[in-house]
UniProtKB/Swiss-Prot annotation:
SUPFAM superfamilies: Glucocorticoid receptor-like (DNA-binding domain)
Organism: Thalassiosira pseudonana (Marine diatom)
UniProtKB keywords: Chloroplast, Plastid, Ribonucleoprotein, Ribosomal protein, RNA-binding, rRNA-binding
Protein name: Small ribosomal subunit protein uS14c
Localization in the cell: Plastid, Chloroplast
Organism lineage: Eukaryota, Sar, Stramenopiles, Ochrophyta, Bacillariophyta
Claim: S-adenosyl-L-methionine is one of the keywords in the record: no
Amino acid sequence: MAKRSMIEREKKRIKLHQKYESKRQALLEEYNSTSDFNLKLEIHSKIQRLPRNSSKIRIRNRCWKTGRPRGYYRDFGVSRHVLREMAHQCLLPGVTKSSW
């Protein structure tokens, strides 16, 4: 189980990303469409003034049940440990144990 503070920090990052997503996207589109160097520097400084945690890159995928950041399966939203437990309990439709 992940520390409670890490899970809360991740939730805070998600909220910040949702809050500043449209503003950041508009600035990036303006930055990419402009060819004037001085204007690009000005836009870049505006982007840098946004909160660091409002960037999507800073968000880490975590298991919804345990908060584990590693061994995360995107399709299910859980870590490998929880995936195995849920598959054995037949809680994931269509998932079967492989044998060959």
